[in-house]
Structures are given as structure tokens and as C-alpha cells.
């Protein structure tokens, strides 16, 4: 593009065309959604203590990256996409392109870090606080920004595409010969001839043959050309009677310095007239993404494809873990309420657990296993080491599955029964069972080979209880016969029952919360792929086949990727109850406070007017009139008392 075409470009812009203004308004509306939504996310986390978690640190970082996209990228991108003219200068063009890649890459890498955080939370819930601590989360966030900067940095130091610059050189009859040269966008005022050697680009030869009118050799002077036997120079011929290019020929130089063309155009004898006095760079009204193939592949892999595959891997593992745990909960954990039978003293509630007995592990090992019980003891609560050592079980060399049913009385009947217990009896306080326990072995027959013990701390407060499966059937049957004899403190037994139920339900509730959070973030990742995958596909195709990508389609897909920055806060509002509540509270603080005050004042005024009208209406009953008169008198008395006179 020559200087004349560049000047005509800025003059041809229709700034006030209705279609352009409507398009600009739509793009700016998207920008407002990006800024407003991500500001809400940041404010919600900082204003709500409930939302201050490690996972939400990554969400805030994601919102910061999206907010910077809305502030530093989208306003300028909207102007460029609508008018196709860059009016902000070449320096800001370079900075804008780098910031665009930086912020978008940081947003994508934040989604990758969130998927890693959810994977650890779902698959390792017990060790999650130590694995993903606040310090480690902050270090990971810092690494995200550094890695994103390394992806956007190369164009700032010269890794850019070669922009074509066309300059006329020679008039020849009805044709004008010119060189199609290239200039690196990192260089100002220097041109390199577009030489093609064999099948790749060749640099200027160190000692090119001299061609021209006797002047000193200058490789950037259009009057000279470094030509050898294997080099080719592309020369275009433009018909002076037409505004379009009529022919493009290839001039091949031999070692005898003779030049022949298909159109018999003698380059050596052409008079060097109308040469441009200055060689200008690229048009300042253009600011586009680079088409350098190497950088396109480098940035596309680092910004999108590698993070996308990492996220898909983590969520596939999360899905598998969620399916396994949900199946275990549905099959091995069930709570039902039974009806009160005739003559029974308990309103039973049945708690069904599923236990796996593994090989070569004792009870102490089971306490350190994460969710996989490798011994014959299932712990409800946190038993003390003394109790664990006292009731430690022997190692087993087989593997079977046991279904255990724990029947415990209601809190009312336990309190009623506790009044008849002997608190001071040490043997009953430490050894008697509180619940009746039965379990089914692998043969399907029900057995009574189990016993539920309870542990009691000082002051009669029970801390935990655990279930032990043993072999002594006669002794166990004898102990179970004493189940109805409840000893100990009346407050410890309901506490034992509630503690065991609370621990199990808390674990299940925590898992379901983690699974729900993972589902919400999976939707975020799905929207991320939907928004960015089409653009990065076209982004890779364009350097290899520029005619294959329609410019309008490329712009639409580019802004579809930008829309991902506006979609994330909407997903939080739709699927997260905590974020939704925080959003409502922030919005009401900003917009509803004045309206509520005016509404209250209007209500007070309407109530007073209604009282006055009711007191003056003659059609009401005498009692109502007396009541209204009393209200009016009280109102008048209150007004008189409030009168400063």
C-alpha cells in the first residue's frame, strides 16, 4: 500500500453512517457487560466472607483479567472493527496487540488453574487444604501472569510478520514497473527486496552484482537489484491507462547481467524516473494481528490449545471421581425413618453403611487413608489413640464386603431412657453399647458379630464413636443383649448419635458441594471452548491460506471470543447461590437505598392521608368514626407535641 492509498483510506471512512453507529453501539454494550459483570464478581468476593476461599481467589484473578480486557482492549477493538481504521498511533497499536494477547491468555490460563483446583478438591478432599493452600494459590496466580506475558512478549522484540510495501520505480511505455518489497514491522524506514531463492526467502547476498546507472550500490535503492543466476525478483507491470494490475511477470537475471521478461520489458534500459524520494513504512491507519506462521503457531498453542487439553483432562478425571463417589453414596449410604411399633420404646432410624475390608492393614492404617477403609474398623468421629489401641483389630488376608446397619433410638426416647441409667457405674460407662448393630457378610446372612462402642470425654461430653467388627460371636451376642441397658450421662448419648450422623452427613454434603462447584466450572470451560475455539481455528488457517478466511467472519469470531469475558459472571449468577446473593446485595446497596427511603416516605404520607380521609368520611359506622377520631386526635396530638412552638 503506497502513501496515496493510505491517505485515501482515512478519507473514505464514513464516521456517521447509521450502520456503523449501530455496530459500534452493540460492541460497546458487550464491553459494558464485560466491565460491569467482572466488577460485580470482584466486589462480591471482597464484600462476602463466605466467598473468600482458595477457589474464589482464582475466580477473582479471572475476573481481573477479563476486566482488563474490557478496559484496555475492547474500546479500541470496537473502533477498529467497525471503521477498519486505526487512529490511535503506531506505538499504541503495538502495545494494544500485546495487551490483547496477554489478557486473553491470562483469562484462559486462569480457567486451567481453576480446573486443577477443582480436581484436587474433588479427588483429595482430606488433603486439599494442605495441597492448595493460600500461599500456593498466590504463587500459581503469579505464575499465570508471567507465563501469559512470555506468550505476548515476542512481537514486542521483533517477532513479527513481513508487511508488503509497494513502491513505483520505472515508467515504461504504457506500463509502470515497481518492486514488491517487504519490510519488517519492527524496522522503520528500511526495506529488503523480496528475493526468492529456490523455495524459501533468501537474504541479500553479501556481494551482489552491480546493475544500474553507475551509482554506488545501495541494496535498498529501487534502481539496483541484487541479482545472480539463481535469484528471482518479482516485478509487477501496471497499465497506465487502467487502474488495475494487468500483468505480473518474473524477471530472471543471468550471469551476463542480461534481463529478459515475458513482456520484453528491459529493466536495465528503463529510465529511473519518478522514483519516490522517501521510502515509507506501513500505513499508520492499519493495526492487525501478525500473520507470521511461527508466532501464530506459538501463540495459539500456548494461549488456547494446550490449556484446553489440560482442562479437558482434569474435568474428565473429576467426572470419573464424581461418578464413582456418587454411586458409592447411593448404594452404601442411606437414611430412612421407621414407624413406631407396638410396644417398642424407640422410634428407629436406620443408617446403612458399606465397608470394604482390605488386605494387610490394621485400624491405625485406616485412620490415615483418605476415604478408603482398609481395615475392619469404620470410624465415626475421631477416636483417641488409647481407644484405638485398645480395640485394634488383627490383620486380615482376605477381601470382602460388609453391609452394616446401625439402629439408634430417637433423641426423645434416649433422654427418657437415660434417666434410669447408673451414671457412676464405670463398667457401664465405658463398655456398654449404645446402639444395636447388625451386618450382612458376603454370604448374605445377617449376623450379630459387631459392636458399637462409645468414647466419653471428661464432663460427660462424648467426642466420638467407632464401629468394630470382630470374631467373638458368643461374647458379642452377650454384649448386644445388654443394648437396652443404657448407662452413663444422659447428655452424652444424644451427642454420640448426633456426632456420628453429623460427621457422615458433613462429608457427603461437602462432596456434593464440591461436585456442584465442579459442574458450574465445567459449564464455564464449555463456554470458553465454544467462544474461543472457532477464532483460534481461523487464526491458524489465515497465515497459510489468507484467502480462505473471510475478514468479516474473522472479526465476528474474534468478538465471539471476547464475549467469553462477559459470559463468566452470568454463569456465576445463574448457578452459584452465594454469588447470586452477593450480587443482589451489592446492587441493592448501590441502587435500592434511595428508592427504599423515598418509598417509605411515600408510604407514610399515604397512611396519614388515609387516616384523615377516614376520620372525615360521614358514611362510616359510629364505632369506626370514634376510632378514626381517636386516631386523628392522637395524630394531631403528636403533631402538636412535635411543634417547636
Curated annotation (Swiss-Prot):
Membrane topology field: Multi-pass membrane protein
Side of membrane Cytoplasmic, spans: 47-56, 116-138, 317-520, 573-645
Pfam families: 7tm_1
Signal peptide: none
Biased composition (Low complexity): 369-385
Family that this chain belongs to: Belongs to the G-protein coupled receptor 1 family.
Alphabetized PANTHER family for the sequence: ADRENERGIC RECEPTOR-RELATED G-PROTEIN COUPLED RECEPTOR (PTHR24248), TYRAMINE_OCTOPAMINE RECEPTOR (PTHR24248:SF174)
Listed name of the protein: Octopamine receptor Oamb
Species this protein is from: Drosophila melanogaster
